[in-house]
Swiss-Prot record:
Function: Acts as a component of the essential kinetochore-associated NDC80 complex, which is involved in chromosome segregation and spindle checkpoint activity.
Family (UniProt): Belongs to the SPC24 family.
InterPro entries: Ndc80_Spc24, Spc24_Fungi_globular_sf
Note: Present with 1750 molecules/cell in log phase SD medium.
Full protein name: Kinetochore protein SPC24
Disulfide bonding pattern of the chain: none
Lineage, uppermost ranks: Eukaryota, Fungi, Dikarya, Ascomycota, Saccharomycotina
Pfam families: Spc24 (PF08286)
C-alpha cells in the first residue's frame, strides 16, 4: 500500500501533515508587524498634519496683521504726502512758521502799544465816582459832544449813549473803526472791530461778556 493510500485511510494524520507543511506563523507575525508599523506611520502623519495646520493658521494670523500694518502705513504715507503737498517743502514749512512767529510778535507789540495809548487816554480823562462805581469822563471829547447836543434830539440821544458806553468802560474809536473795551478787573483793553460782517447781536454779546470779566 502506498503512502498516499495510508494518508487517505487516516485523514486526521493527513490533515496534521498538511497543517505542518503550511507554516504560516511567520506570515502572521509579519502581518502584525506591518499593521503596527502602519498604525505608527498613521499617527505620525496625523500629528505632522495637525502641526502643519497650526503653522498655516499662525501664518495666516501674521499675514492678516501685516496686511493691517501695511494698510495703516499706506494711510500714513498718503496723509504725509497730502501734508507735504500742502506745505510744499520743509523749507516752506519753516518759513511759514517763522512768518507766524513774526506775526504773533507784531500782534503782541500792537497790543502793548494800544494798551499804552489807552492808559494815556485814561490818564487825560477824569474819573468820577458814582454809587454804582466809577466812570470815565474824557476831558477833551466831552466838550465837543456837549456842543453837538444842541443840534438835534437824535444827536443828543446818541451823545447820551456814548456817555453811557464810556461810563461802562466802552470807548468808540471811530478813527480806526473799532471799539475799545476797558476791563475793570485787570485794566486790559479788548478790541472789537466795527465790521459790517458782524451782527449787532454778536457785537453786543461780545461787549457784555468782556465787561463782565
Amino acid at each position: 500500500m502506498s503512502q498516499k493510500d495510508n494518508l487517505l485511510d487516516n485523514p486526521v494524520e493527513f490533515l496534521k501533515e498538511v497543517r505542518e507543511s503550511f507554516d504560516i506563523q511567520q506570515d502572521v507575525d509579519a502581518m502584525k508587524r506591518i499593521r503596527h508599523d502602519l498604525d505608527v506611520i498613521k499617527e505620525e502623519s496625523e500629528a505632522r498634519i495637525s502641526k502643519e495646520h497650526s503653522k498655516v493658521s499662525e501664518s495666516n494670523k501674521k499675514l492678516n496683521a501685516e496686511r493691517i500694518n501695511v494698510a495703516k502705513l499706506e494711510g500714513d504715507l498718503e496723509y504725509t504726502n497730502e501734508e507735504s503737498n500742502e506745505f510744499g517743502s520743509k523749507d516752506e514749512l519753516v518759513k511759514l512758521l517763522k512768518d507766524l512767529d513774526g506775526l504773533e510778535r507784531n500782534i503782541v507789540s500792537l497790543r502793548s502799544e494800544l494798551d499804552e495809548k489807552m492808559k494815556l487816554y485814561l490818564k487825560d480823562s477824569e474819573i468820577i465816582s458814582t454809587p454804582n462805581g466809577s466812570k470815565i469822563k474824557a476831558k477833551v471829547i466831552e466838550p465837543e459832544l456837549e456842543e453837538q447836543s444842541a443840534v438835534t434830539p437824535e444827536a443828543n440821544e446818541n451823545i447820551l449813549k456814548l456817555k453811557l458806553y464810556r461810563s461802562l468802560g466802552v470807548i468808540l474809536d471811530l478813527e480806526n473803526d473799532q471799539v475799545l473795551i476797558n476791563r475793570k478787573n485787570d485794566g486790559n483793553i479788548d478790541i472789537l472791530p466795527l465790521d459790517n460782517n458782524l451782527s449787532d447781536f454778536y457785537k453786543t454779546k461780545y461787549i457784555w461778556e468782556r465787561l463782565g470779566k
